[in-house]
Amino acid sequence: MTVLKNERYLKALLREPVDMTPVWMMRQAGRYLPEYKATRAKAGDFMSLCRNADLACEVTLQPLRRYDLDAAILFSDILTIPDAMGLGLSFGVGEGPKFARPVENKSAVQNLPIPDPEQELQYVMNAVRTIRRELKGEVPLIGFSGSPWTLATYMVEGGSSKAFTKIKKMMYSEPKILHLLLDKLADAVILYLNAQINAGVQAVMVFDTWGGVLGHREYLDFSLQYMHKIVDGLIRENDGYKVPVTLFTKGGGLWLEAMASTGCDALGLDWTVNLAEAKARVGHKVALQGNMDPSVLYASPARIEQEVQQILADFGQGSGHVFNLGHGIHQDVPEISPKVFVDAVHQYSVSYHQ
């Protein structure tokens, strides 16, 4: 059994007592750090960086050297699964992801292989093992995947989208084909996350970035149903510790009760949700992660501290809160801002845990 020096993050996700509120940042390993840009340049391109275990480890650890973070998150991408399915993923300079072979019909769905995590995605598992070794038990390591719905949006659209017309056309005109794809993706995500857990991640998160573009019934049928299947299929204890599961739907504030009923341990919240309200609605069932608007980091240190204090006050006394941004950190925030943010969370949260 690995002894963790800092268990704050895992304890908060399980709503166990902590000395202060734990904090990490979505996309904490990323383009806002000059050392990340240097490492990416060394790798050549984004996916080469993901596929090199030593470099992926290096960028995972970079933010921990600068800031007093309570967790590390695996440096990877949500599109590793569709890439391993053979869709021809590429990232153009300054562009989002593109797939050379989008999924457009039933035969394309039927022909998709379910990747073996220790074969086609072995580079991710190698990165997990390398990071765990180099962390030396300082903080827990978070693994992650995209949700089936979010992965499907990229696979059907052929890349990023604003209107999601292709996948919504499939959803309304040929729902059986989309359900077939989502079911296959859920199976792939279960295998992938369980392999990450076996390789050493100590908590997992499912990112449903685009669930919020769906109508009420469609969210339950085409997104949440498949995240529920994933939660049911995950390893929940490993190496003497429970392995907490966090679900995050951006724009998902309407569905907190339904999300909390999946059996997950925590819900990620974006900044459109009031934390006090969310706690009143589902705080008896799950922990909550979030939820400062990442754009606050453009503000003065005093304004950042004010926002942190407000969000801590919204959650109030007790455990069950992991402080985070409501989405990924922006790449051009002032260099001092993340430190001000992280230190403020620790400084001002102590009184809520006494």
UniProtKB/Swiss-Prot annotation:
GO biological process, alphabetically ordered: protoporphyrinogen IX biosynthetic process from glutamate
Signal peptide: none
Keyword match Cell inner membrane: no
Binding sites annotated in the UniProt record for substrate: 27-31, 77, 154, 209, 327
CDD domains: URO-D
Pfam families named in the record: URO-D
Location in or out of the cell: Cytoplasm
GO CC terms in record: cytosol
Swiss-Prot/TrEMBL site (Transition state stabilizer) positions: 77
Catalysis performed (reactions): uroporphyrinogen III + 4 H(+) = coproporphyrinogen III + 4 CO2
Record-listed E.C. numbers: 4.1.1.37
Pathway stated in the Swiss-Prot or TrEMBL entry: Porphyrin-containing compound metabolism; protoporphyrin-IX biosynthesis; coproporphyrinogen-III from 5-aminolevulinate: step 4/4
Predominant location: cytoplasm
Disulfide pairings: none
Matches recorded under SUPFAM superfamilies: UROD/MetE-like (SSF51726)
A molecular function GO annotation: uroporphyrinogen decarboxylase activity
Protein task: Catalyzes the decarboxylation of four acetate groups of uroporphyrinogen-III to yield coproporphyrinogen-III.
PANTHER family reported in the protein's UniProt record: METHYLTETRAHYDROFOLATE:HOMOCYSTEINE METHYLTRANSFERASE RELATED, UROPORPHYRINOGEN DECARBOXYLASE
Subunit description: Homodimer.
Protein name in the entry: Uroporphyrinogen decarboxylase
Phylogenetic placement of the source organism: Bacteria, Pseudomonadati, Pseudomonadota, Gammaproteobacteria, Pasteurellales
